[in-house]
Every structure is written in C-alpha cells, then in structure tokens.
C-alpha cells in the first residue's frame, strides 16, 4: 500500500522526461541582481527592501564534507522581489542589517527547505518570523509529500528550473562569486516569489497569514 501511494504521488507531478521538454525557466537578468558585501550597499537599498511585503528567501553555505566539521554558514543570504534579487555575503554588519527584516512579522518570507535555515539563523541570534515553507503548500493538488522548487515550477508553469549539483556544492564563502553562482542563487530566491503568487491565485494559500496584519493580494496586472 505504501509503495502504491508513493507512485500515485509521483504521477501527479511532471516526469523528469517531461520536464526536460519544457522551456527553460527565465530568472532575473544580471542587471537586476545585486551582490552586497558592505554595509554601505545595504543602506543604498534599505528603503526598497524594508517596504517589500513579500520576499523570496534562500541561503547558501559552503559545504562540509568531513565528519565532525561544524557548519559556519549561511555564507550567502538571498532575498528577492518581483523586480530584483539581493545576494548578501554574510558578515556581522550585514546580519544586523537583515535582522529587523527577518523578524518583521509583516514581511512575508517564502521559500523551500527553510527548516535548516531557521536553525542556522537561530544560532546567529535571529528568529525568523512570517516564513512560509512552500514545499508543503501543494495539498490542493492531491500531493502530501514535500515538493521541491524544480517540481513546483514544472507543475505550475510547465517550465524547466535547472539545478546544478556542481554549483550548489561550490564554495559559497568565496569573496568573489562566479557568474553561475550569482545566477543560481538569485533564481533560488526569485522562483519562490512566482510560485507563492501562483499558489495564492489558485487559492492554495490563505489570504490571511497568521501572526501578521497583512491581507495578501494578487498583483493587478497578473494575467
């Protein structure tokens, strides 16, 4: 019975073969991705970031391969709106700048696999508030298992969201990120914004988010 249930769940999502035939997911262009590593840059974007009611959210950490090694990440924190992605190379000053945003209950943060992120942020003295784990928002499709970002994009938009293991396991603590790292990190924060809006449009997310004063609305120009 358990095996049949898992198979039924799988059939509700596009197959790997189908996904390969879908058009490639279009993320933000490089000129809309801001890499931030100094407090002065934070001050330049403070107004636009702190007034955003919805933020896509993800983090990247330098991988650890040896037993007993301690994870010191996150080394990169990604936030995104519909228009821009912000990639923060973590320092004490940048964490202090981001702390009010992450602890603001009226700024919704959406993403995938955020349980470990919450643990890492707690170690840094930051309590994440109003965070929505999108992997668990597909019950209305008959899917009870967690759905990853790649399958979510395929299901909702019939697009292929590329995931590269070589990039995901690269050194995220390096001072100068490569262009593939920048594009990868931005997409991981931007995609959840689109997924959240589509789930909201389809009635899969309540318009009243607990512990906030927000009443979520779909963008007027959404077709």
Segments predicted by a language model, with ranges:
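N-terminal accessory regions of nucleic-acid-interacting proteins
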Residues: 1-55, 134, 202-212, 217-223
């Amino acid at each position: 019975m358990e095996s049949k249930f898992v198979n039924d769940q799988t059939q509700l999502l596009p197959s790997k073969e189908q996904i390969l035939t879908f058009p490639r997911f279009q993320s933000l262009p490089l000129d809309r991705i801001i890499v931030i590593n100094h407090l002065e840059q934070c001050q330049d974007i403070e107004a636009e970031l702190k007034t955003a009611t919805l933020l896509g959210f993800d983090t990247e950490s330098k991988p650890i391969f040896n037993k007993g090694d301690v994870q010191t990440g996150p080394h990169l924190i990604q936030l995104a709106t519909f228009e821009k992605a912000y990639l923060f190379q973590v320092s004490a000053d940048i964490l202090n700048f981001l702390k009010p945003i992450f602890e603001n209950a009226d700024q919704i943060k959406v993403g995938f696999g955020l349980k470990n992120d919450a643990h890492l942020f707690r170690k840094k003295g930051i309590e994440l508030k109003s965070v929505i784990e999108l992997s668990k928002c597909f019950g209305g499709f008959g899917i009870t298992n967690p759905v990853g970002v790649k399958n979510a994009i395929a299901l909702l938009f019939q697009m292929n969201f590329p995931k590269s293991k070589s990039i995901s396991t690269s050194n995220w603590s390096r001072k100068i990120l490569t262009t593939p790292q920048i594009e990868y990190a931005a997409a991981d924060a931007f995609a959840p914004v689109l997924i959240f809006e589509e789930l909201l449009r389809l009635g899969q997310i309540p318009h009243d988010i607990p512990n906030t004063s927000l009443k979520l609305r779909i963008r007027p120009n959404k077709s």
